[in-house]
Amino acid sequence: MFISSSLIFTQNKKSSIGVALYRFDDNYIKYLKSYIEKNIGNKASLTILDSHNSQITQNDQIEIFLNRKVNLIAINLVNESYAQTIINKVSVRNIPIIFFNREPDLEALNSYNNVWYIGGSSENAGTAQGRVIADSWKSHANWDKNEDGKIQCIIIKGRTNSVESENRTQYMKDYLKKNNIKLNILAEVYAFDNRKTASIEMDKLMAKYSQKIEYIIASDDNMALGALDSIKKLGFNNDSRMLNYIPIVGIGGTPEYLEEIKNYSVFATVMQNPSTQAEVLSKVSLNIINNKSPLDGTTLSFENNKYIFVPYIPVTMFNLDRAIEIYK
């Protein structure tokens, strides 16, 4: 039953799981939360808290879980750099931790036996994004506006202290370099995972580079949509024939972004299936609280004894229907 807009509680005396989500109003997280609830069902007591995109709030929520003596804490970090701080606090109680969806570094995970990560790999995300950019560049010769063989691009990244965002961008660049595709980066800016901020930053860049930009590459769909908001005001990406068009490529696969692919407003994204991520998280969590091996009864495997990676899949108009079906 619902206690408040940011708290869900399901009664079960046998075992308990506390989940902290970085923000409920993120479209992808909204579906992830729903799938977690569905997979856990009545198999455990489940408390899900909304961290409202505040690491301070999330830290307080960890204290709530500790005071309630939950059997496992699952955390979608607001800020990956706080993973070690959380591990230090929780490990004293010897409570298992699963980080998910936002990837902490291996050094932090190796500091405690009972901590793991489930979700995407920033390497996989960036590589998949690089692949979809490379494939589209090779198949659309007309997108090379100045015919110099280089991609004139804007790169939009998340928070300045986000290792995941930086890694996504770097692995994208690495893939393109390995495939002999050169980038001419007109600007590389931070938009803090925020659509409005991305739109404001893009407004400034369009004033300077509007006729030069050949790609907009964002490390998150939300920021990619912010870029779209900006360029649409100047008449770009408003035509299904893809005239006066700047290809935009994001990461995430949110329902709203997929709708814009359908409208020919953005070109592509790479996504994880939230149902798959929630299913893996739920199976591993239930195994742990029932004193089983984390991977018991699954075909899953660990990387570096700590990571269970859920792959990213490129999404364009060609496989869009399959991606949309995930959210139904």
Residue positions per predicted region:
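Short acidic/histidine-rich motifs immediately flanking catalytic phosphotransfer sites
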Residues: 62-73, 95, 209-214
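Hydrophobic alpha-helical
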Residues: 75-92, 172, 186-259
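Short, solvent-exposed amphipathic alpha-helices that sit
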Residues: 27-42, 125-129, 163-182, 197, ...
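Short beta-strand elements in bilobed, periplasmic/extracellular small-molecule ligand-binding domains
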Residues: 40-51, 155, 177-192
